[in-house]
A protein has these predicted regions:
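A short, Trp-centered hydrophobic/proline-enriched beta-strand micro-motif
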Residues: 28-43, 79-83
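Residue-level marker for the onset of beta-strands and adjacent loop->beta junctions
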Residues: 49, 78, 130-132
Length: 176
């Protein structure tokens, strides 16, 4: 059974690469209902749209529709970019399938809580099996914050703190 069969999206060991400070900032900013820009590509043309997203364990989770252009584009090219709240990143888009399937139960329950303010406003049809969870596994990115520049790469000593006078936290995942 792979990760998609159990309704999770592994962030390419990115979480082991982020410093505890960077992870804390990611959770504070994105571990709730947040709007991010999601960019996909179709025939060498970028397409950007705002989506509601929730961050957990190196991945963003988004409720969307399987027949939407964004999912069609991700099926052709899973490489995506995101941006929001002083954060930019690349990742891999992965359709986890129907929101209501048993394998997605844990993340779906979290999304119901996180998106409680709008989830039942009629925009989503949870009886429709095309209502799906999109997972964006982060591969690399840049997080801006207060006073620290942290790099994370593939080396054994993955996190190095430098130049505390700057407001930059940076990380690189394994697929970069």
């Amino acid at each position: 059974m792979d990760a998609t069969e159990i309704g999770i999206c592994i962030g390419d060991n990115l979480m082991r690469k982020l410093s505890s400070e960077a992870e804390k900032i990611m959770i504070e900013r994105f571990g709730k209902d947040t709007v991010i820009a999601l960019a996909t590509v179709e025939q060498e043309m970028p397409y950007v749209r705002n989506v509601n997203a929730y961050y957990e364990d190196g991945s963003f989770y988004i409720i969307t529709y399987a027949l939407s252009n964004k999912i069609k584009q991700i099926e052709e090219n899973p490489n995506v970019a995101i941006a929001g709240d002083w954060f930019t990143a690349h990742g891999k888009g992965n359709n986890l399938g129907y929101f209501g399937k048993e394998e997605n139960r844990i993340i779906a329950e979290k999304l119901k809580i996180v998106f409680a303010e709008w989830i039942d406003n009629g925009h989503n049809d949870f009886d429709d099996e095309n209502t799906i969870i999109l997972c964006v596994k982060l591969t690399d990115g840049l997080l801006l914050s207060h006073g620290t520049r942290v790099y994370s790469d593939d080396s054994e000593s993955a996190t190095i703190t430098l130049q505390t006078d700057e407001n930059i936290l940076s990380f690189v995942g394994e697929d970069s």
